[in-house]
């Protein structure tokens, strides 16, 4: 019921995380459904070990545990689950800040500027470079930029996640990449005219279909980033988040105020 309410509110990303957590816990339990009675201290401890044995990172394990805790707490509030003092006390629900996300400087330079000798990887590289040059812009924000967002040498947009209005200067080094990636197809009537051809811009779809299209585009981009990193012989893992955190780390070392970095991220 709670996941259904999240969908009605348009919070598809949050609903997706809850669904993933429940799907994972059902796999551990070996059942098609999960009851509150299956969420016990012993079960949770074994479930945590189960996740680690499958190679999940501490922060992913924590996310799944926090989703289960939230669901259980809602069950307690509604009277459908018994209150158990510190039920989740023995499992990890924190955030491991030691998980490095920024690339070393030499690998970052290779990722963004070394020729991968492949047209489709050059396109991936150009998208990554724009994300970096646009102050660590998220892939979601880049994908949803419309042609009207670009006004002379400035891009104006609202963050997808927070709706915060933002603006970034387009440097000369970014202009060629924008020209290379620019969507030259006319938009359909009453549909967004996206600057880049990452999304289709079909407003006739339901919102959840649009969310699924974005998730598909994100998975594709992350797969392409892995291919780019492999072609350039990088040893560090690379995702869209890597680019954002690499920009933040670079900006910090160059003396950019933390407040400005946090606002961009």
Q: How would you describe each model-predicted region?
A:
Residues 1-54:
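Basic/aromatic-enriched alpha-helical hairpins
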Residues 24-27, 37, 53-87, 135:
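N-terminal DNA-binding recognition helix of tyrosine site-specific recombinases/integrases
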Residues 73-82, 131-152, 259:
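Short, charged phosphate-coordinating catalytic segments
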Residues 85-139, 143:
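Basic, Lys/Arg- and aromatic-enriched nucleic-acid-binding interface segment
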Residues 108, 171-235:
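Active-site/catalytic core of tyrosine-dependent DNA strand-transfer enzymes
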Residues 116-118, 156-169, 208-217, 235-242:
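Short, contiguous acidic/charged loop-to-helix segments that flank catalytic cores in large enzymes
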Residues 117, 213, 222-263:
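Short, basic (Lys/Arg/His-rich) helix/loop patches that form interaction surfaces
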Residues 144-183:
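Conserved tyrosine-mediated DNA breakage-rejoining catalytic core shared by Y-recombinases
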């Amino acid at each position: 019921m709670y996941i259904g309410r999240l969908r009605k509110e348009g919070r598809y990303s949050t609903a997706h995380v809850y669904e993933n957590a429940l799907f994972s816990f059902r796999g551990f339990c070996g059942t098609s459904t999960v009851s509150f009675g299956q969420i016990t201290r012993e079960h949770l401890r074994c479930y945590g070990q189960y996740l680690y044995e499958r190679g999940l990172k501490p922060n992913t394990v924590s996310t799944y545990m926090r989703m289960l805790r939230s669901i259980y707490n809602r069950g307690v509030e509604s009277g459908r689950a018994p209150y158990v003092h510190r039920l989740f006390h023995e499992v990890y629900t924190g955030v491991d800040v030691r998980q490095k996300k920024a690339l070393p400087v030499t690998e970052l330079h290779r990722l963004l500027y070394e020729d991968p000798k492949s047209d489709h990887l050059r396109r991936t590289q150009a998208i990554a470079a724009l994300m970096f040059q646009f102050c660590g812009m998220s892939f979601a924000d880049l994908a949803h930029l419309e042609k009207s967002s670009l006004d002379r040498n400035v891009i104006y947009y609202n963050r997808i996640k927070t709706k915060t209005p933002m603006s970034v200067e387009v440097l000369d080094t970014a202009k060629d990449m924008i020209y290379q990636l620019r969507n030259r197809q006319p938009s359909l009537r009453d549909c967004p005219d996206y600057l880049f051809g990452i999304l289709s811009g079909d407003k006739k779809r339901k919102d959840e279909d649009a969310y699924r299209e974005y998730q598909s585009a994100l998975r594709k981009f992350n797969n392409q980033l892995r291919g780019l990193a492999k072609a350039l012989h990088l040893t560090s893992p690379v995702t869209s988040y890597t680019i954002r955190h690499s920009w933040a780390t670079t900006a910090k070392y160059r003396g950019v105020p933390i407040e400005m970095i946090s606002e961009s991220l």
